Amino acid sequence: MAQMTMVQAINDALKTELKNDQDVLIFGEDVGVNGGVFRVTEGLQKEFGEDRVFDTPLAESGIGGLAMGLAVEGFRPVMEVQFLGFVFEVFDAIAGQIARTRFRSGGTKTAPVTIRSPFGGGVHTPELHADNLEGILAQSPGLKVVIPSGPYDAKGLLISSIRSNDPVVYLEHMKLYRSFREEVPEEEYTIDIGKANVKKEGNDISIITYGAMVQESMKAAEELEKDGYSVEVIDLRTVQPIDVDTIVASVEKTGRAVVVQEAQRQAGVGAAVVAELSERAILSLEAPIGRVAAADTIYPFTQAENVWLPNKNDIIEKAKETLEF
């Protein structure tokens, strides 16, 4: 075991798969010589060579096309979209080509592509760098969408993503890159894609969330417990597919739920969770499902995000409203 940041855990996972499988290739803007904008791929080109870890031109559509071609020829590409706000430049390659490969070929071809991309608020980025676009990707058939909330999950989920025979979008919240460390096994391990994690057990209310909002939800749970409430916190880990069985079981136990996301409220992952709970756990609910999300505006940049992003106080307020209904 070693104490790792999320950056270190992701780097370790990439290194593990480069060693294990000669067909794994890593590429994107600045991922080679510089080791990526956040140094996530630092040292990998030096260790594994320019043929396996390499830089591309600043052209997201070209990166996606390259990944598609390599995948159908038997490689396992790990492509990076430098910031998730630029995913629209490569959206056709991802959702229109890579995601459809198995269906389009009648199962004779697969596209084992891992699409890595930093996203998320709290670091005061310029416009288009922090956008939370996981809902759009999750709605694209053929894609799995994974969002780790810490170093341990980051390594295990990335190894699982690279080994998947179907495409996985692996989103890395920038605020979590170096904000804390966790014990991470130095040996390889996997975490099942599509399986949520009960971060904290409780009996009075279920807080269902993912990504950076897991940390905010855990802080909120601590404060709520000081007032005598028993709070369960569930980290989805994967937003496509959603682990419906786990969240339904939790709500059947607690009778109340608050769904938390950093992204805008409209048509997001949170809305999908609420719909599933409404269909499958409605008779267990003792109060309307609470929702915490950002406002339905464009993502603000730099310091403006301080008043836009959801935080633990928003979660506490909504949880108390739900508990006292």
Curated annotation (Swiss-Prot):
InterPro entries linked: THDP-binding, Transketo_C/PFOR_II, Transketolase-like_Pyr-bd, Transketolase_C
CDD domains xref list: TPP_PYR_E1-PDHc-beta_like
SMART domains to which the protein is assigned, alphabetical: Transket_pyr
Reaction catalyzed: N(6)-[(R)-lipoyl]-L-lysyl-[protein] + pyruvate + H(+) = N(6)-[(R)-S(8)-acetyldihydrolipoyl]-L-lysyl-[protein] + CO2
Listed cofactors: thiamine diphosphate
Domain of life: Bacteria
An annotated Gene Ontology molecular function: pyruvate dehydrogenase (acetyl-transferring) activity
Key words, A-Z: Oxidoreductase, Pyruvate, Thiamine pyrophosphate
Biological role stated in the UniProt entry: The pyruvate dehydrogenase complex catalyzes the overall conversion of pyruvate to acetyl-CoA and CO(2). It contains multiple copies of three enzymatic components: pyruvate dehydrogenase (E1), dihydrolipoamide acetyltransferase (E2) and lipoamide dehydrogenase (E3).
Complex and partners: Heterodimer of an alpha and a beta chain.
The protein, known as: Pyruvate dehydrogenase E1 component subunit beta
Annotated organism of origin: Staphylococcus aureus (strain Mu50 / ATCC 700699)
Gene name for this UniProt entry: pdhB
